[in-house]
């Protein structure tokens, strides 16, 4: 099945915790059918930047409808996998924004680590990681 365009509006920061609890905890099944575990400590991490809180809904969209998944590009985190997506704020948004979700592969499944809009130079670095999965066009 071809990838669906990811159209997800920004959420209100005041709704972030409710959305986090409803959409992501205790786990999400990703595009490959794997379980990604999410816990309250992950929300504390996301709270560090308002931009991340406004994009809670983008985390679910990126885990379930990514453009690609790559192995981590950093030698110190060989167990990291990164979901890459372009998310559009509305049907009228023609550019969208890149969005990445990082998870760590553990013994029991995948553990959520982070999610953010990467700088273009950092996205280039992420894309140096080995391709694990790619959406069909």
Task: Annotate each language-model stretch with its function.
Residues 1-137:
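Ribonuclease/tRNase effector modules and their secretory precursors
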């Amino acid at each position: 099945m071809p990838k669906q365009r990811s159209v997800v509006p920004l959420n209100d920061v005041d709704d972030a915790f409710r959305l986090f609890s409803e959409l992501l905890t205790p786990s999400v099944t990703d595009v490959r059918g794997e379980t990604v575990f999410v816990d309250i400590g992950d929300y504390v991490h996301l709270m560090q930047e308002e931009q991340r809180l406004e994009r809670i809904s983008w985390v679910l969209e990126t885990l379930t409808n990514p453009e690609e998944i790559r192995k981590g590009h950093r030698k110190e985190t060989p167990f990291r996998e990164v979901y890459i997506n372009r998310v559009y704020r509305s049907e009228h948004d023609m550019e969208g924004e890149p969005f990445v979700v990082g998870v760590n592969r553990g013994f029991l499944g995948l553990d959520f680590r982070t999610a953010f809009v990467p700088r273009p130079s950092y996205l280039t670095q992420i894309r140096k990681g080995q391709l694990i999965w790619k959406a069909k066009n």
